[in-house]
Every structure is written in structure tokens, then in C-alpha cells.
A protein has these predicted regions:
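Conserved SAM/AdoMet-binding glycine-rich loop
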Residues: 1-109, 114-116, 141
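Catalytic palm subdomain of template-directed nucleic-acid polymerases
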Residues: 119
Length: 211
């Protein structure tokens, strides 16, 4: 980072690694190093990051050294779905991290997904309620996307085994790149139709930005 600043005049650094920070001690040491050099730049965590090691002290240190943007990826507001997709995160920790981040005036985005293969309507409504709660807490942006099975994931293998995914070609990968298309429909949920999922997504986005 210091090399990029001195040689190229870099003013902002984006950390695209989803697991950039896994230990509190590393976060604090990184922030101290920025202050000791000293380096003047802003930095972001725009791709989603783990929150287990982040507390008020960590987020205060991050903000004081130029961290302006924090993206969290709880994925679902349903504990049942979090267990199904093996997402080892507690929603209570997400809410706590948001509170601390907003106290530091950070821009906070949260990513959510609906339409997992075994998801039920009750799970979707829990996710929509979580999105609305994010809005009330001051979260600046939300990504509410329909589930897309990525090759190599357990859910992708499951869908191949059940015959839901048959052909992998250029159009399949193109579909993975249009997550923000509100008209996009999911074809992988066993309990909810694509049209109904698209409706839920629209309701969620309107509710978040409407409040």
C-alpha cells in the first residue's frame, strides 16, 4: 500500500478478499501500522467480510485510519436457512456490528439472498423483515438478490444431482452476472415460484429504500 501511495499517488484501497480480517489482533496491528508510518488514504471492504472478530474497538480503529465502507453478508434473515447453507454467522452479531459501524459514520451495505432451493415463504419473510430492520438501523444500501448456484458450491452439486441444473454454457454464466436485474427470475427454489420470488424481492427493496 505504501508503495502504491508513494509511486502512483493511490488515495483509496479496496480489499476484495472476503476473509481479509479473521483475527482481532491482526486488525488492530494493521491499523496501528497505518498510523505509525503514517499513511493517508481511505480504504474499503466492499465485497463482504467476516464479523466475528469485529467489535467497537476494532471498528473505531478502522474508521480512524480511513475505513469508509463496510459490506456485510448475512445472506439470510432466517436461522433455519443460515443453518441449511452452513453460514456460520449469528444475526445478533451482524446487528451489533452495524450499530458500532454507524457510530463511526461508516457507509454500511448488507447483502441478502432469497430463493435458496429449500427455502420456504416463512424464511423469505424473515429475510425481508431483517432487510427492513437494517433500514431502521441506518444501513445505507442493501443487496437483495435471488439465489444463483455457483459451480463448485455444495448447492450447485445438489442441484445437478436433482436434475435442476442440466447444461452449463455461456448463457448460464451470463445469468450469474445480472444479480441486480429486478426482472430476473430464479428457477431453483422448490417451494416458491420464480414470479413470486421476484415479487418478494421487489417488496423487500421498496421497503428498505422507502423507509
Amino acid at each position: 500500500i505504501e508503495h502504491y501511495i508513494n509511486r502512483y499517488g493511490a488515495q483509496n484501497i479496496d480489499f476484495m478478499d472476503l476473509t481479509a480480517f479473521t483475527r482481532k489482533s491482526w486488525i488492530m496491528e494493521f491499523c496501528r501500522e497505518i498510523q505509525d508510518r503514517p499513511l493517508n488514504f481511505t480504504w474499503q471492504l466492499p465485497s463482504g467480510t467476516r464479523v466475528e472478530q469485529m467489535d467497537g474497538e476494532c471498528l473505531a480503529a478502522m474508521a480512524s485510519t480511513g475505513c469508509m465502507n463496510l459490506t456485510l453478508a448475512p445472506e439470510s434473515g432466517s436461522d433455519r436457512m443460515l443453518k441449511e447453507i452452513k453460514k456460520k454467522v449469528k444475526l445478533s452479531k451482524i446487528f451489533e456490528t452495524i450499530r458500532h459501524a454507524k457510530q463511526q459514520r461508516m457507509f454500511v451495505k448488507c447483502n441478502l439472498i432469497i430463493g435458496f432451493p429449500t427455502e420456504r415463504r416463512k424464511d423469505v419473510w424473515k429475510t425481508l423483515w431483517t432487510s427492513l430492520r437494517f433500514s431502521f438501523m441506518g444501513v445505507d444500501d442493501v443487496g437483495l438478490n435471488l439465489f444463483s448456484p455457483y459451480p463448485g458450491s455444495e448447492l450447485f452439486s445438489y442441484l445437478q444431482t436433482t436434475g435442476k441444473i442440466k447444461k452449463i454454457d455461456h448463457s448460464y454464466f451470463e445469468d450469474l452476472m445480472v444479480l441486480q436485474n429486478i426482472r430476473r427470475s430464479s428457477h431453483f427454489c422448490e417451494n416458491i415460484s420464480p414470479l413470486e420470488l421476484s415479487f418478494y424481492r421487489l417488496v423487500g427493496l421498496c421497503s428498505f429504500y422507502g423507509f
